[in-house]
Amino acid sequence: CERHDHDTLYKLLPKDGSVKLNPITTRLGVLVLAGPNSRKVLQKLTSTDLSNEAFPWLSGQAISVGHTSCHALRVNFVGELGFEFHHPIEQQVALFDLLMEAGREFGIKPYGIKAMSSLSIEKSYRLVPRELSIEYSAYESGLDRFVHPNKGEFLGRDALVAGREKGLNWNFVTMEVHGVSDADSDTRG
């Protein structure tokens, strides 16, 4: 995913050198706080208004969590209320410890990427590279609600609209399997 994004952005850079691409992946960390009590946990650590009105789903804000400055996103991939924190990597351990301590009264537990991946399938959230790739259009991937071709020009807009008018080759759907009580949760198969 990162390599693809880098290559795509690099190809789009102006040839005159007026814009530079500066990868910051190794300088930033990402932690996710998710679950029905995530707002209560986070509110203990920040003065930012975390209400739905002030911090709606799919929005982002610069906030402080304890002593850590973060770019917080009101999004996650586990199907619960949650927040993503993008922060300086050198603050990651302190931020993790702070979140765990603040969440102790709510029974907070850490979860890993494989658990997140399984939960995202359960919620029908698609991820790169599992379901989303350059091989399937946004419409084929079930991302219709995020695509607004009438809002103006964007890269690939004409091909996307033409593909939809022609008809979709694929349609991603979520299926539920009943009667299986012991299954491997590895979503990569």
Regions flagged by a language model, labelled:
Residues 1-189:
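Conserved, structured C-terminal
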